[in-house]
């Protein structure tokens, strides 16, 4: 029996290798820095989600150490048992102040937040409208809910409305979207999505994982670029593991919606709570991003510079308008070759292939941070452009 299973595993892995979709993990150190250590070499880090450089911030480290001294290392239980430390209540109040919502709840990760929220809100008699390029956690949440799924073409509001029009009015409806799309670097049209959700009586849930801490008033997210919009969004989800440099995620909205999810969400109920040290770093990070406008501004400037120069050099960066800059090279083999070449040049940037992105859109996903210097980015661009010319990606 064991041999039969192993043969199945080997065959499956070999098929991935044949399609250039096999994945490996590589030991990396100092990934919280603009320059990291990988395979013993010092390399420029253009692959990290540490957008504001807070993962290595001394203030967050001290907050974690102090909380561990006070509360210990582990939460000891789920929040519904004895894991609901006072820190949870304090941080959730901070989130409400930051996001201007009635209530918030902290969840262990962005994945468990999306999977849990969507599957608790919707059921087999309901309909979910999901952008085709939404994150995998949204896709999995929709599947787990058992609801009928209607996927609309990426950022295509006309297609979304067509799908809404053909759905019986009595059906409960949820529209769900990323705000900053993690593999595209473009942004959802929230104002228009709000208009559609109001017209057709749907709930609207947004995933601010790659926007929280960066965009909008006090870094509260894309929903807060125009403050009046945020109050019209039913469920806000975001993570602390990217721009805030910590771990975990939040769900925020009105009081009854959050209370409902606390009572229905299996990924909240049946898991041990986050450690106190993590909660303390979240509290510290929120305080920093709310006030540190200069750090957010540096990130946006770095993103615009990197994006514009690569586009001018002839690279296909899609519709990116953020700090996430994909260079689309179509085939899996080309993406792997490109990634290998940039890493040989001293840059960490990873090939992204199906199923993470659609077929024939494999790419290198570059991400810049506020902590990259102009000289870092100038040097990287020279390497990337030279490689592109050598490999025929640009003329």
UniProtKB/Swiss-Prot annotation:
The modification N6-(pyridoxal phosphate)lysine is found at residue 242. One of its GO terms (biological process) is biotin biosynthetic process. GO terms for molecular function: 8-amino-7-oxononanoate synthase activity; pyridoxal phosphate binding. Keywords: Biotin biosynthesis, Pyridoxal phosphate, Transferase. Substrate binds at residues 23, 135, 356. Pathway: Cofactor biosynthesis; biotin biosynthesis. Its cofactor is pyridoxal 5'-phosphate. The keyword Calcium does not apply. Catalyzes the decarboxylative condensation of pimeloyl-[acyl-carrier protein] and L-alanine to produce 8-amino-7-oxononanoate (AON), [acyl-carrier protein], and carbon dioxide. It catalyses: 6-carboxyhexanoyl-[ACP] + L-alanine + H(+) = (8S)-8-amino-7-oxononanoate + holo-[ACP] + CO2. Its EC number is 2.3.1.47. This is Putative 8-amino-7-oxononanoate synthase. It is an enzyme of class 2 (transferase). Homodimer. It comes from the Bacteria. The keyword Plastid does not apply. Pyridoxal 5'-phosphate binds at residues 110-111, 182, 207-210, 239-242. Pfam families: Aminotran_1_2. Belongs to the class-II pyridoxal-phosphate-dependent aminotransferase family. BioF subfamily. It comes from Bacillus cytotoxicus (strain DSM 22905 / CIP 110041 / 391-98 / NVH 391-98).
């Amino acid at each position: 029996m064991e041999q039969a299973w192993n043969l199945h595993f080997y065959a499956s892995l070999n098929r991935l290798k044949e399609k250039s979709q096999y994945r490996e993990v590589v030991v990396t150190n100092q990934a919280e820095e603009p320059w990291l250590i990988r395979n013993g070499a010092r390399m420029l880090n253009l692959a990290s989600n540490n957008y504001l450089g807070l993962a290595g911030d001394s203030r967050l480290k001290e907050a974690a150490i102090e909380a561990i001294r006070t509360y210990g290392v582990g939460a000891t239980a789920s929040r519904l048992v004895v894991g609901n430390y006072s820190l949870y209540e304090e941080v959730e109040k901070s989130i409400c102040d930051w996001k201007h919502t009635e209530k918030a709840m902290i969840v262990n990760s962005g994945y468990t937040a999306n999977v849990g929220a969507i599957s608790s809100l919707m059921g087999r008699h309901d309909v979910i409208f999901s952008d085709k390029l939404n994150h995998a956690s949204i896709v999995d949440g929709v599947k787990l809910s058992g609801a009928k799924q209607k996927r609309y073409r990426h950022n295509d509001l006309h297609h979304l409305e067509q799908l809404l029009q053909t759905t019986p009015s009595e059906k409960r409806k949820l529209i769900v979207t990323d705000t900053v799309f993690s593999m595209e670097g473009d942004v959802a049209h929230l104002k228009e999505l709000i208009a559609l959700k109001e017209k057709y009586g749907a709930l609207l849930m947004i995933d601010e994982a790659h926007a929280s801490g960066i965009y909008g008033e006090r870094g509260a997210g894309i929903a807060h670029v125009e403050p009046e919009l945020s109050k019209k969004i039913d469920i806000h989800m975001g993570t602390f593991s990217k721009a805030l440099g910590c771990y975990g995620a939040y769900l925020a909205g009105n009081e009854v919606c959050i209370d409902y999810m606390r009572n229905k969400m299996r990924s909240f109920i049946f898991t041990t709570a986050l450690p106190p040290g993590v909660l303390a770093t979240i509290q510290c990070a929120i305080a920093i991003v709310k006030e540190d406008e200069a750090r957010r501004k540096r990130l946006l400037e770095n993103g615009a510079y990197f994006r514009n120069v690569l586009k001018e050099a002839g690279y296909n960066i899609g519709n990116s308008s953020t700090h996430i800059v994909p260079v689309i090279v179509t085939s899996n083999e080309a993406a792997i070759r490109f990634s290998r070449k940039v890493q040989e040049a001293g840059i960490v940037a990873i090939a992204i292939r199906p199923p993470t992105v659609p077929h024939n859109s494999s790419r290198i996903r570059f991400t810049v941070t506020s902590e990259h210097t102009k000289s870092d980015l100038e040097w990287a661009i020279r390497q990337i452009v030279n490689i592109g010319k050598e490999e025929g990606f640009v003329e």
